[in-house]
């Protein structure tokens, strides 16, 4: 991958080229419609309106019977890899001969004489003395009409990043029209086909200026590709494939993994790479690095330095050998002060010797954790104290905090209201054992101190459930066959107090039956004696592990990263770059495909970080497929529908939501953000679609939504809950869901990872020992009775697992310096339309107001789930942030 470091000046002086040209599309301007008005009425073929700087998209003049030519200067702002300074070679020769960038200007209008596209204006752009610029001067007939597109052919032997192209008529800067490019342009030696860039004026398909209709369709065909051959680095082809590249059976037969995206293992689709299949398994694709993603989906230089599979992998590969002599790969920490030492004393890092060049690599990748010992030249791997531990080092041990985090922690999207009792499994009892839960009426009512019956508590909406029983139970025996790990199915019931806080009543752990053993299940409560109290703490550790694993595999990876990739692919394949919906969604897709490719390369792959350190081991991603098949629905990805579906909210007669838990920080702040996004989407759709008929008649939009359903989420294509994209209301809901998932939902489940899981006893990723009372073996019970704290520590992740996860979460929780936050930057196409610009400014203003509202909520002592002694305030849905690990900020996209 080539990363940008310094902008390079590439420029030249080109001779005038006498050809037809004129200009349509400009920054902060409104187009005349390129031969039509915005309503679709044709303009006179003999008159080209002279637009103002505020409203015009094109530069134009009144044409009389005598044809005249205008001089148009094209200024290209470019940025190319810094390696060009070292080895320019053939490109220097090309520059000397004037062949650098070939520009072609495409008229929005057809030639009235022939009814065909006007002849294009061509000219070479050459280096100038100004850094990073090319310039061309072209002679353009006044009758050329508005420019609807610029074609660019890169004559260099290397790709080039072009930021924008500015067209100036007659040397008058006030006529400047900017084509926003922000794209890599391949060398013609890689692909002779020039790139096409359209005006910032957005057009529905039916409103496309006739001169660029064919080009609009051709561009989409190019982006779709032909579905054959292996993709190359410079290409921009978007296509679908199954998750068949997680395994590596040619390297190790134990690394064979099932294909996800089949009838047996349903899954969203990923971007096709076309790599050959492995020798051992014809269904598995060979692995390679880097993994192909379309060129413009790749990281910027700044982002690439912040996170990539290479940096992550090299950082961990440097850490592990460096600390291996000091840590035990299979043992846990012997006492809690040893865990605390990770944040105070740290682990010595050798500069040479056992760790090789470990210090330099680690310092480059995760500099936050490398610190110098005072008055020495030695360095240590010392983790930052997570905010939760900084505020209250014992909070993780308390039941109140355990419950509070289900509403305001890392995974606040899984708790449900208990609406049916008794609790019964939906799994086959012939396979897994009796379906009835061990959480009986007697146990729950006892833990409620007889205040009310279970039925009364359910009626008053006081009972809530965290249910990881049916999703994990089928994997219990398989996971237990893996070394040094165990698994149960679990259920936890909570009671809503009069103060609006939750308290856990009971936990159920279940082991399914097997050919040699009956089902085992038991309900645990915090009890009134030491033994029951410690068993309760062990049971909580198992539940926290289940919640942590489900969070990472489903709430985070599946519901954001994996499910969004099909939207990105379909958007690029079916919506033109000049389609208003494309331009609305594009900022929400930044970096996601590259992040997902890197995750397949280093995080979720066979023997990757997730498999090595999380509860389900090699079954982890397969388990996310089970969750996708059983529970994922597009319609309930809408925050209000999700809350209603989980019984956490009801819709009143006035349409507003009423929460079952008044102080539910994720829901409170989330609805604030959701409402802002929906209003922005509604204002945007209202501008471009005047009626439901406009939506239903949009052929690109229809093809886009059809492809999302039938190709991107093909394993769910026949589900009845898919909305139909045929009305403005439905379109607004669809767009709001996509924008919410990529922004608010992802921010809520990602950027608090180090704050809450950086201290791993609070969010263990794996439990390595069965709870002692399962087998009731004398030796285990004797050890438990003598040293219960030691049993807990031996159950938690090993020293090496903990270090690996902590280092990974430090990287994954961080905002890049080039992060783009929602509501912060307007796209050039939005600025080109005054009404859209005004709508965006209102959207941005609402998000700024949300910052203050969230601060007030966090400072209100009545909100006990987000304000109190030692409590981490809920800031994950505050829209803006500084770079680094901050625990706040909503980027536009899934960028990490």
UniProtKB/Swiss-Prot annotation:
It comes from Hordeum vulgare. Residues 202-896 form the Lipoxygenase domain. Residues 249-267 have a biased composition (Basic and acidic residues). The keyword Chloroplast applies. Its main location: plastid. Pathway: Lipid metabolism; oxylipin biosynthesis. Residues 249-289 are annotated as: Disordered. Plant lipoxygenase may be involved in a number of diverse aspects of plant physiology including growth and development, pest resistance, and senescence or responses to wounding. This enzyme exhibits linoleate 13-lipoxygenase activity. It is found in: Plastid, Chloroplast. GO terms for cellular component: chloroplast. This is Lipoxygenase 2.3, chloroplastic.
């Amino acid at each position: 991958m080539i990363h940008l470091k310094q902008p390079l000046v590439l420029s030249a002086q080109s001779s005038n080229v006498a050809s037809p040209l004129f200009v349509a599309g400009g920054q902060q301007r409104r187009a005349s419609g390129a031969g039509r008005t915005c309503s679709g009425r044709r303009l006179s073929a003999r008159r080209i309106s002279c637009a103002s700087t505020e409203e015009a998209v094109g530069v134009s003049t009144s044409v009389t019977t005598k044809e005249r030519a205008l001089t148009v200067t094209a200024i290209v702002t470019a940025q190319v890899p810094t390696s060009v300074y070292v080895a320019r070679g053939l490109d220097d020769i090309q520059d000397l001969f004037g062949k650098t960038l070939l520009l072609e200007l495409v008229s929005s209008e057809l030639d009235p004489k022939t009814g065909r596209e006007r002849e294009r204006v061509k000219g070479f752009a050459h280096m100038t003395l100004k850094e990073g610029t090319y310039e061309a001067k072209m002679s353009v007939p006044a009758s050329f009409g508005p420019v609807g597109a610029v074609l660019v052919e890169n004559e260099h032997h290397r790709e080039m990043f072009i930021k924008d192209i500015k067209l100036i008529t007659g040397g008058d800067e006030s006529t400047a029209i900017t084509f926003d490019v922000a794209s890599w342009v391949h060398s013609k030696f890689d692909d002779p086909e020039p790139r096409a860039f359209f005006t910032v004026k957005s057009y529905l398909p039916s409103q496309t200026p006739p001169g660029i209709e064919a080009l609009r369709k051709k561009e989409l065909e190019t982006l779709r590709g032909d579905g054959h051959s292996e993709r190359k680095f410079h290409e921009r082809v978007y296509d679908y494939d199954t998750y068949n590249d997680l395994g590596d059976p040619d390297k190790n037969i134990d690394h064979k993994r099932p294909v996800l995206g089949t009838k047996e293992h349903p899954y969203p689709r990923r971007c096709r790479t076309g790599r050959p299949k492995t020798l051992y398994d014809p269904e598995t694709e060979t692995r390679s690095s880097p993994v192909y993603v379309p060129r413009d989906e790749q990281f910027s230089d700044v982002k690439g330095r912040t996170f990539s599979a290479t940096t992550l992998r090299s950082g961990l590969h440097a850490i592990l050998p460096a600390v291996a002599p000091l840590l035990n790969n299979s043992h846990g920490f012997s006492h809690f002060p040893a865990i605390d030492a990770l944040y105070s004393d740290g682990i010595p890092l050798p500069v040479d010797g056992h760790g090789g060049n470990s210090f330099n690599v680690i310092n480059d990748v995760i500099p936050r954790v490398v610190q110098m010992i005072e008055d020495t030249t030695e360095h240590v791997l010392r983790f930052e104290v997570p905010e939760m531990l900084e505020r209250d080092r014992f909070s993780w041990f308390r039941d109140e905090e355990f419950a509070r985090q289900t509403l305001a922690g890392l995974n606040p999207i899984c708790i449900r209201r208990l609406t049916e009792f008794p609790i019964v499994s939906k799994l086959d009892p012939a396979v897994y054992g009796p379906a009835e839960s061990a959480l009986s009426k007697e146990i729950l009512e006892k833990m409620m101190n007889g205040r009310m019956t279970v039925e009364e508590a359910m009626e008053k909406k006081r009972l809530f459930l965290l249910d990881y029983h049916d999703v994990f139970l089928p994997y219990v025996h398989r996971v237990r066959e893996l070394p040094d790990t165990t698994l149960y199915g679990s259920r936890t019931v909570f009671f809503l107090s009069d103060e609006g806080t939750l308290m856990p009543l009971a936990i159920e752990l279940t082991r399914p039956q097997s050919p040699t053993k009956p089902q085992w299940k038991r309900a645990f409560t915090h009890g009134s004696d030491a033994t029951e109290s410690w068993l309760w703490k062990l049971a909580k550790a198992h539940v926290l592990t289940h919640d942590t694993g489900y969070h990472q595999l489903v709430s985070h990876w599946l519901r954001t990263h994996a499910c969004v990739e099909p939207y990105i692919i379909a958007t690029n394949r079916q919506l033109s770059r000049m389609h208003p919906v494309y331009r609305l969604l594009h900022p929400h897709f930044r970096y996601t495909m590259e992040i997902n490719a890197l995750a397949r390369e280093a995080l979720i792959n066979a023997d990757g970080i997730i498999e090595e350190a999380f509860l389900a081991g090699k079954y982890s991603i397969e388990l996310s497929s089970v969750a996708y098949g059983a529970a994922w629905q597009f319609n309930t990805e809408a925050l209000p529908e999700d809350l209603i579906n989980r019984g956490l909210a009801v819709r009143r007669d006035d349409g507003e939501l009423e929460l079952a838990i008044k102080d539910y920080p994720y829901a409170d702040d989330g609805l604030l953000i959701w409402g802002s996004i929906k209003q922005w989407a509604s204002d945007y759709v209202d501008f471009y679609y005047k009626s439901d008929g406009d939506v239903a008649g949009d052929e690109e939009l229809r093809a886009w939504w059809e492809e999302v359903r039938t190709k991107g989420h093909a394993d769910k294509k026949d589900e009845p809950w898919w909305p139909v994209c045929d009305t403005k209301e439905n379109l607004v809901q669809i767009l709001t869901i996509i924008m919410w998932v990529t922004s608010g939902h992802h921010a809520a489940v990602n950027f608090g990872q180090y704050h809450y899981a950086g201290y791993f006893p609070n969010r263990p990723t794996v439990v390595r020992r069965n709870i002692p009372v399962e087998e009731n073996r004398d030796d285990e019970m004797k050890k438990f009775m003598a040293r219960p704290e030691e049993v807990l520590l031996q159950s938690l992740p090993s020293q090496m697992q903990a270090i690996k996860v902590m280092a990974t979460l430090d990287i994954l929780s961080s905002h890049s310096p080039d992060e783009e936050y929602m509501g912060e930057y307007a796209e050039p196409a939005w600025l080109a339309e005054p009404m859209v610009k005004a709508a965006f400014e209102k959207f941005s203003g609402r998000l700024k107001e949300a910052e203050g509202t969230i601060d007030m909520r966090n400072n209100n002592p009545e909100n006990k789930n987000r304000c109190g002694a030692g409590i981490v305030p809920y800031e994950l849905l505050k829209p803006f942030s500084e770079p680094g690990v901050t625990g706040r900020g909503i980027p536009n996209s899934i960028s990490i």
